[in-house]
């Protein structure tokens, strides 16, 4: 029996098709409360502490989001606070949504920008997204919830970061949050290079781009991450990582005693270690049942887990890395990229 299991069922999908999303862009489903109850019942015998969520892409996307929130609470042994991720799509279409979040005790809500209107709409994959984000910022402040802006940075949008500085200044976000006792936040980063974000590899930032990040955004970012330099936020160049890891003989088990499982609309199950994709698939909950899925997970039988447990780091890196690249990665994100590439190369 595992100490804790968290089950996340992608019941309704997502309104966006974001070009940065590590979870990937897959078709939306329309699963029911009975489906959520089924998923919870399957994993219930295998843990002393079960936590259930009705989403893993867009929170509160379904019209009955409040009922689903209550159902998740009844199916779970723990009740966490609402995530700081909120649905912009819902916020501008449901007059009761922000007030509901406020009553749940939400203090901070994170929103994602990529630059100005055209660029943000492009990366979000939906026209009108930028204007909806700005409207949501106003709604949050009206309800005394502090917005926190996350900015993904690539070569392609680095020159638009000043538009975000102008937005923060024009909307007077720091002072307006301070007025009700809140704190405005903002940070920039490149994210992990998996899912849709792996497609941005050719536009990945290098040390040359870091000098183009405006001082205001640098200051906010260092405060958010508790770091002293942007190098600590964006990581090392691939060339350095390659040099070090290409002689690394270690392997790694990716098994946890408190796993989180993502279940898609077809009831295929994946660990939340990377993009839900074939190399991470543990089985199908309806056809295989939770016991077989847990056996697959605990014994590292998914392709990606098996490779990471049995293949030295150096083999992954030498096979898939670029020894001359100046792209910036955190070590674990880089290893995840190497592992996903290696797995795909094996089956193609």
Q: PLM features: what roles do these ranges have?
A:
Residues 1-35:
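Canonical Radical SAM [4Fe-4S] cluster-binding loop centered on the CxxxCxxC motif
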Residues 5-7, 48-52, 83-85, 109-111, ...:
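Hydrophobic faces of well-ordered beta-strands that scaffold small-molecule active sites
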Residues 14-21, 257, 272, 343:
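Short cysteine clusters
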Residues 26-39, 57-106, 113-119, 126-131, ...:
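Canonical radical SAM enzyme core domain
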Residues 30-31, 114, 126-131, 138-256, ...:
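Radical SAM enzyme [4Fe-4S]-AdoMet core and its adjacent flexible, acidic
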Residues 41-46, 72-77, 99-106, 141-142, ...:
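Acidic (Asp/Glu)-rich catalytic clusters
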Residues 41-57:
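Short Fe-S-cluster ligation motifs
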Residues 268-348:
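Flexible mid-to-C-terminal extensions adjoining Fe-S/redox cofactors in radical SAM and related proteins
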């Amino acid at each position: 029996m595992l100490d804790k299991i968290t089950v996340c069922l992608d019941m309704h999908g997502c309104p966006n098709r974001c070009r940065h999303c590590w979870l990937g862009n897959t078709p939306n489903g329309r699963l029911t409360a009975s489906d959520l109850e089924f998923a919870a019942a399957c994993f219930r015998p295998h843990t002393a502490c079960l936590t259930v969520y009705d989403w893993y892409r867009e929170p509160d996307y379904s019209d009955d989001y409040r009922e689903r929130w209550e159902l998740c609470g009844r199916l779970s042994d723990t009740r966490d606070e609402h995530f700081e991720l909120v649905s912009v799509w819902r916020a501008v279409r449901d007059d009761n949504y922000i007030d509901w979040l406020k009553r749940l005790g939400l203090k901070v809500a994170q929103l994602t920008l990529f630059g100005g209107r055209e660029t943000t709409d492009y990366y979000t994959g939906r026209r009108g997204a930028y204007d909806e984000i700005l409207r949501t910022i106003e709604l949050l402040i009206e309800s005394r919830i502090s917005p926190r802006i996350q900015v993904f940075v690539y070569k392609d949008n680095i020159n638009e970061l000043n538009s975000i500085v102008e937005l923060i200044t024009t909307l007077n976000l720091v002072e307006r949050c301070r007025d009700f006792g809140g704190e405005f936040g903002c940070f920039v980063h490149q994210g992990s290079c998996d899912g849709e974000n792996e497609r941005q590899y050719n536009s990945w930032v290098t040390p040359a781009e870091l000098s183009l990040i405006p001082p205001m955004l640098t200051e906010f970012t260092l405060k958010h991450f508790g770091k002293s330099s942007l190098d600590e936020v964006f990581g090392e160049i691939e060339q350095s990582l390659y040099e070090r890891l290409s002689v690394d003989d270690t392997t790694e088990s990716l098994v946890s005693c408190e796993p989180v499982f993502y279940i898609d609309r077809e009831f295929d199950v994946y660990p939340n270690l990377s993009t839900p994709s074939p190399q991470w698939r543990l089985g199908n909950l309806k056809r295989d049942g939770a016991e077989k899925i847990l056996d697959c997970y605990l014994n590292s039988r998914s392709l990606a887990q098996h490779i990471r447990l049995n293949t030295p780091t150096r083999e992954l890196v030498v096979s898939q890395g670029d020894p001359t690249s100046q792209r910036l990665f955190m070590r674990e994100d880089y290893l995840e990229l190497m592992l996903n590439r290696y797995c795909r190369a094996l089956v193609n």
